[in-house]
Amino acid sequence: MNVYERTQQRLKTVFDLFDNIYVSFSGGKDSGVLLNLCIDYIRQHGLQRRIGVFHMDYEIQYRDTLDYVNRTLAANADILDVYRVCIPFKVQTCTSMFQQYWRPWDGSMRDIWVREMPEGSLTQHDFPFFTDEMWDYEFQNRFAEWLHRRSGAKRTCCLIGIRTQESFNRWRTIYSDRNHYRCLLYTSPSPRDL
């Protein structure tokens, strides 16, 4: 069985078991392939359902990546529920000797934003759990819980595209024996059927 066939098997399992599915989509190669596989799966199998797309918009991004994200979301609006978040969470930085983190979409720095916030974006006011001390990765985890409650789903699945060849830590995350669901490996457990 080749990688594509194995992916189709895994997607069938995901779509059979979870009533709420969303893809974490950065606009990069890995998440782009995964999102397009999901879109194709829905269309090829005639599924009458939508999937969520969680896009953390970091304000500063390559123009081609922004164009790709916008094009992909617009072309598939009929089956995608888009959660494009523009949040001033803390983000690690190695470009400053004076700051350990920076904040995209920081309202107090609006006059130097790199670009305008995209129309229809979700902001910190849409998330009651957001605090100024929150880091981007903490926000991701809290978003999953928020979306699960908001959707009223029985089971929520977040799909993340990862190439393990890029990092030993990524490889360890994927090939860990700690987390199983119906004989399938997954990266991290969450409470309440997430």
Regions found by a protein language model. Name each.
Residues 1-188:
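ATP-dependent adenylation/nucleotidyltransferase module used to activate substrates
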